[in-house]
Amino acid sequence: MIRAFDALSLPLLRLLDPEDAHRLAIQGLRLLPQAAPPADQPNLSVRAFGLNFSNPVGIAAGFDKNAEAPDALLRMGFGFVEIGTVTPKPQSGNPRPRLFRLERDEAVINRMGFNNDGGEVVLRRLAARSARGGIVGVNVGANKDSEDRVADYVRLIEMFAPVASYFTVNVSSPNTPGLRNLQQAAALDDLLAKVIEARERVRAIAGDTPVLLKIAPDLTLNELDDVVHIARSRKVDGMIVANTTLSRTHTLREQARAKEQGGLSGRPLFRLSTRMVAETYVRAEGAFPLIGVGGIDSGGAALTKIRAGASLIQLYSALIYKGLGLVESIKQDLASTLLRTGRDQLSEIVGADAPMITAEDWPV
């Protein structure tokens, strides 16, 4: 089914405007037959944040912003789905065009601006599917015009706690003015304190829903020191490393398109994000697991991210170029690598290369 979907959809979608193609892909997924997801190899199972994942490959926030197709994505073989970013009020985001393919670089630039249907609509969708199981996380953010952004996060934690498998506190999107300022030490400490307090208030009805923090790859190492210290002191359950980057390398082939404003994702982000995973892993000292994101487009890339320190990984941009078949390909490669090297579980290799990657001679 997945091969057929890719064979039919990829050539067509590449002819369309990127945002129109994305909309069509979501609609297509919703129409697929409700077949059971493929069984995962036992050695791919991961326990993290108090949750049991059948495999480590998730889909990152931004693909299914409005929780329209989480079950279809789980049937495609993802071990977990992260919907959003969701804001309390619906918002249209930034003006179009706001999504750009850099095809020769297998990259994407976006300046979407948290366009979404708003908390109430998305909550109804998740509530309607909550009995179906599967790990579905909720990525939460603040409205662009909010007068109290911390209150936006708190409200969403309280709203979605009964239906979210986990929360991701997104303070790292570059496309909402001022949002990344919430990564600064004092602001982040205040935000996480209030988010954790909100989680505790609804624990009686929702349980101990894990709270993760998603950071930018553009932090300096001194800034990362502060972020990880605060995350540990506030006892967050994990971190997602990393969001899109504002940086542009001279090696990009599509230099004209690279001048578009917004966050860059895809293959050019791989080394920067992997370095950030390793740096975060070393600083966390086992306090919490990491989800590695950024430029993963093969089993080898997934393995590198895991050996850098990621217990789980997420995909998005590579799916535009390689299709949903990439999910099974990565899982097969990871399972085969474990068998070939005599390892029983992925947890045995998490962070194995972090010291090497954080060394000065590992280029970004």
Swiss-Prot record:
Keywords: Cell membrane, Flavoprotein, FMN, Membrane, Oxidoreductase, Pyrimidine biosynthesis. Pathway: Pyrimidine metabolism; UMP biosynthesis via de novo pathway; orotate from (S)-dihydroorotate (quinone route): step 1/1. Substrate binds at K65, N110, R111, M112, G113, F114, N170, N175, N243, T244. Its main location: membrane. GO terms for cellular component: cytoplasm; plasma membrane. It is a peripheral membrane protein. It holds the Pfam family DHO_dh. It is found in: Cell membrane. SUPFAM superfamilies: FMN-linked oxidoreductases. The active site is at S173. FMN binds at A61, G62, F63, D64, K65, T85, N139, N170, K214, A242, G266, G295, Y316, S317. GO terms for biological process: 'de novo' pyrimidine nucleobase biosynthetic process; 'de novo' UMP biosynthetic process. Its cofactor is FMN. It catalyses: (S)-dihydroorotate + a quinone = orotate + a quinol. GO terms for molecular function: dihydroorotate dehydrogenase (quinone) activity. NCBIfam families: PRK05286.1-2, PRK05286.2-5, pyrD_sub2. Belongs to the dihydroorotate dehydrogenase family. Type 2 subfamily. Monomer. Catalyzes the conversion of dihydroorotate to orotate with quinone as electron acceptor. This is Dihydroorotate dehydrogenase (quinone). It comes from Rhodopseudomonas palustris (strain BisA53).
